[in-house]
Amino acid sequence: RDYYASRGLGDVYKRQVIDNRLVNVISFRQNKGIKEPLYCGELYIDAENNALVQARLEINPAYVRQATDMFIERKTRKWKITAQEVVYTISYRQWNGIYYMNHIRGDLYFKVKLKRQWFSSSSLHTWFEMVTCKVDTDNVTRFQRKERMPTRTIFSDTHFKYDADFWGEFNVIPWEEELGTVIEKLSSKIEQIEY
């Protein structure tokens, strides 16, 4: 079954510059006949070496409400939660001729409404972000099974040993500081840690 369609060449393929490099931007969306929540978005491919340098994905806005159960693991009886928008941005950076994951950000927007109340809805925006501080390819091994968590785990139900002193002054990153500057400072902190 063909889930995705490409539009006319003018709509699908564009060119843009990312990190001083020319990239081809390829847009994709699901076929009109498909009525389930699939992803749509853009892939940013380096024009010179065909490497994927960035991707922007989102649940098709027309069907994002149907995807609510994908993101809500446990529901309460008092509240109704509906997905409004789900967007992911992933970027890759070249290091020693190989592209590695550099930055991930996910933005999830929900409408939250108290059941049996007419005018009680509000918006909830939750997001996550990960930035690669250091790439180390020496002696890389997979995580052991006991070190992995099931994908459906609810973090607030999990008991972790948290070292409040580990991050030191970086425990909270101020909004006004640029993320790249903070990562540089944080990288030097990580370099000091002995294993």
Regions found by a protein language model. Name each.
Residues 11, 23-138:
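Gly/Pro-enriched, hydrophobic low-complexity segments
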Residues 8-9, 97, 148, 167:
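Short linear sequence elements within intrinsically disordered, low-complexity coil regions
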Residues 19-20:
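Short acidic/glycine-enriched loop/turn segments that link adjacent beta-strands
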Residues 107-195:
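Secretory-pathway-linked proteins and extracytosolic
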